[in-house]
UniProtKB/Swiss-Prot annotation:
Organism: Corynebacterium jeikeium (strain K411)
Biological function: An accessory protein needed during the final step in the assembly of 30S ribosomal subunit, possibly for assembly of the head region. Essential for efficient processing of 16S rRNA. May be needed both before and after RbfA during the maturation of 16S rRNA. It has affinity for free ribosomal 30S subunits but not for 70S ribosomes.
Compartments where located: Cytoplasm
GO MF, one annotated term: ribosome binding
InterPro entries: PRC_barrel-like_sf, PRC_RimM, RimM, RimM_N, RimM_N_sf, Transl_B-barrel_sf
Gene this chain is encoded by: rimM
Domain PRC barrel: 91-183
Protein name: Ribosome maturation factor RimM
Gene3D superfamilies: PRC-barrel domain, RimM
Length: 187
C-alpha cells in the first residue's frame, strides 16, 4: 500500500518550479534532493527526480530534473505523489487505514493487561473512521447491532488514548477497549 505524500498545485515562476501541497509529516525526507518520486495524473504514472525543494507559505517549491520550464511545469498540475509508508519501530503510531476496519472488543473482566494473554470481553463494534481534532485522534466505532448497549447500530466517538485503547493488534485485526463508564453510551 502506498500513501499520498503530496500534490502539485500549480507552476511557480518561469524556471520549472512547482508548488506542492505536502501531505506527509516528513516532507524534508520525502522531497529531498535526488529522491525519485512516483506520481499519478489522470491514470498515467510518471517518475520525477527532485533537483531541489524549499518551504514556501506552508507548502513546498520543488524543481525536478526532468522539468526545464514553466510550460513543462504546467503539465504537472494535479499530479499526486505516492510513497510506501515508513514505519518507525519505536513509534506506537498508526496510519488511519490500519485502524479502520478493526473489530473492537471490551477487555474481559478480571484480565490483567500485563500478562501475555489478553482475554477479550464483549464485542463492541467496528472502527469505521478516524477523526483528527485539536484535542487528538478519535476512533469512530459503529456499535454492533446485536450489542446490549443503548447505542447499538449507532456510531460513537472514542478517544484514541492508551488508557482507553490499551491494545491494538493489526495481525488479529482487533483492538481492546477499557472505556470509562458511560463512554460507549454517548452518540
Amino acid at each position: 500500500m502506498e500513501l499520498q505524500i503530496g500534490r502539485v498545485i500549480k507552476p511557480h515562476g518561469v524556471r520549472g518550479e512547482v508548488v506542492v501541497d505536502p501531505t506527509t509529516d516528513t516532507p524534508e525526507l520525502r522531497f529531498a534532493t535526488g529522491e525519485v518520486l512516483k506520481g499519478k495524473q489522470a491514470g498515467k504514472e510518471l517518475s520525477l527526480t527532485v533537483r531541489s525543494f524549499r518551504p514556501h507559505q506552508g507548502r513546498l517549491l520543488v524543481t525536478f530534473e526532468e522539468i526545464a520550464d514553466r510550460t513543462a511545469a504546467e503539465s504537472l498540475r494535479g499530479v499526486r505523489f505516492f510513497a510506501a509508508p515508513v514505519h518507525d519501530e519505536d513509534d506506537d503510531g498508526f496510519y488511519d487505514h490500519e485502524l479502520e476496519g478493526l473489530t473492537a472488543y471490551l477487555l474481559a473482566p478480571g484480565t490483567d493487561l500485563k500478562g501475555d494473554e489478553i482475554q477479550l470481553g464483549d464485542l463492541v463494534g467496528e472502527v469505521v473512521a478516524v477523526e483528527h481534532t485539536p484535542a487528538g485522534q478519535l476512533l469512530v466505532i459503529l456499535i454492533d447491532a446485536e450489542s446490549q448497549l443503548p447505542t447499538a447500530g449507532k456510531e460513537v466517538l472514542v478517544p484514541f488514548r492508551h488508557q482507553i485503547v490499551p491494545v491494538v493488534d493489526l495481525e488479529e485485526e482487533i483492538l481492546v477497549l477499557t472505556p470509562p463508564e458511560g463512554l460507549l453510551e454517548l452518540s
